[in-house]
Regions:
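Short helix- or helix-capping micro-motifs
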Residues: 36-44, 92, 96
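Short acidic/glycine- and proline-prone juxtamembrane loop motifs at membrane-interface regions
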Residues: 45, 51-58, 225
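Specific aromatic-rich, kink-prone transmembrane helix
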Residues: 39, 58-77, 87, 234-238
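Membrane-lumen/periplasm interface segments of specific transmembrane helices
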Residues: 95-171, 176, 181-194, 206-207, ...
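Membrane-embedded, lumen/periplasm-facing catalytic core of multi-pass transferases
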Residues: 251-378, 405, 416
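Membrane-interfacial loop-to-transmembrane alpha-helix junctions, especially the N-terminal start
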Residues: 201-209, 270
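Perimembrane helix-loop-helix junctions
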Residues: 68-92, 102-136, 249, 257-262
């Protein structure tokens, strides 16, 4: 149950790899397609993120599938089979149903297609509207079955994130963050190759898509790496084109049986580029995927095994951590009461949620919280708060049971070097 969702996501990711290869082959040829796939598989952020069960990962795969079928991106749009555009629209509509912000991508592509296609009225009225209505109707029905009432989730999503800037509740970045930090970190050492690929290929439509998506997302206050994940493979595809150009074989003269023959000489520049990309990306991929912030996984694996133990004493777990800090029930898979600090956004911007209150003053919050709690058998917290709560924990008869490494450096808050499990002891 723990591995199944991740294995399923890895299969979905493989579909994305396939369509990146197919799209690159259509646009740039076989050699570029191979190197585009190399870039996709060796880029540290794709390695780190694409197999995670995030809606952004699925959105990225659907984006690659849809881009492959759009006629406006092909060298000869009129030669594309008529059914391809239906496939493109369907994949785009599903991507928007999963993440409404995916519409940012498809507004750009839709305008390109509108200018490219001959029968604009047919495109809009007989293709876009019916397919969009079908997918939207199915999402309405699914939401009704799950919520028990008619809810327009995409509208609520757009209202919260765009019209009311609700995402700012979780933190903001300067307008240039994607350009100077976010997307540049994601591309990492592939940046010069992507830029070279854009200039050499002159594929301005796809390059424009990257600029459009980054530009629109830059207008929003709340920014995250994963938001622009769908355009990362496109940038890597340009890296593949650049590597292909570097790898053009040279013919070198060589004496053969007394005469003069030729042998293939592979570009030294390509070999140096590949070594550079592997040396810089492989350590990052391994460290970020297997070391950095691993404590959240390790602590839940430990609790999951402890619950199954015959001498199990776990009957209620309290997470005194920032909300959503661990995989929670998706790893535990046992009917054990658990609770974590609430971080539901409030319409009152000045109101602090439980998570913020705890981080602002851990001891004061824990003291007030303990007045009305159902005493847990175990408490999970980070060492940064543990240092302030040791006396509180000991006074309530909790002692340390297990400690797990979490991170070497801080990310968006103070360093959380380890995550600790405390257990209640009967006196």
């Amino acid at each position: 149950m723990i591995r199944a969702p991740r294995l399923f996501q890895s299969m979905i990711s493989a579909i994305g790899d396939l369509y990146l290869y197919k799209l690159s082959r259509v646009l740039f040829g076989d050699s570029s397609a191979i190197w585009a796939l190399f870039a996709q598989l060796t880029n540290w952020f794709m390695f780190f993120c694409i197999n995670r069960t995030l809606s952004n990962s699925l959105e990225t795969v659907l984006t690659l599938v849809s881009l492959y079928y759009w006629p406006c991106l092909r060298p000869s749009p009129s030669a594309v089979p008529s059914g391809y555009r239906y496939c493109a629209l369907l994949a785009a509509a599903v991507a928007c149903a999963i993440r409404p912000t995916s519409a940012i991508t498809w507004i750009y592509i839709g305008i390109l297609e509108l200018f490219t296609t001959r029968n604009k009225l047919k495109f809009v009225c007989l293709e876009v509207v019916p397919i969009g209505a079908l997918v939207l109707g199915l999402t309405f029905l699914l939401d009704y079955l799950l919520y028990g009432s008619w809810v327009v989730v995409p509208l609520n999503f757009m209202k919260f994130n765009f019209f009311s800037s609700g995402g700012d509740y979780y933190g903001t970045h300067p307008w240039h963050w994607y350009m100077t930090q976010g997307f540049t970190v994601m591309l990492f050492t592939f940046i010069p190759f992507s830029i070279a690929g854009i200039v050499e290929s002159k594929e301005w439509k796809l390059a424009g898509l990257i600029a459009w998506v980054l530009g629109v997302y830059s207008l929003l206050g709340h920014k995250e790496f994963r938001f622009v994940l769908p355009v990362l493979p496109i940038a890597l595809m340009f890296s593949g084109y650049s590597l292909s150009e570097l790898g053009q074989c040279e013919l070198a003269k060589k004496k053969v049986n007394g005469g003069v023959g030729y042998r293939v000489k592979h570009s030294r520049k390509l070999k140096m580029a590949l070594l550079f990309l592997l040396v810089t990306n492989a350590p990052m991929a391994i460290y970020m995927s297997m070391v950095h912030q691993r404590g959240a996984e390790d602590v839940m694996n430990y609790l999951s095994e402890a619950v199954r133990d015959k001498e199990n004493t776990i009957n209620h777990i309290l997470f005194l951590t920032p909300c959503h800090a661990t995989p929670y029930y998706s790893t535990l898979h046992q009917n054990i009461p658990m609770c974590f600090l609430d971080c539901t956004p409030s319409e009152e911007r000045v109101t602090m949620d439980e998570s913020d209150q705890f981080l602002a003053n851990p001891l004061d919050f824990a003291t007030r919280f303990a007045q009305n709690w159902t005493r847990p058998s175990h408490i999970v917290l980070f060492d940064s708060q543990e240092n302030l709560l040791k006396e509180f924990l000991h006074s309530h008869n909790f002692s340390e049971i297990k400690r797990f490494f979490h991170a070497h450096f801080k990310v968006d808050r103070e360093l959380q070097a380890s995550i600790v499990v405390y257990g209640f002891r009967d006196c």
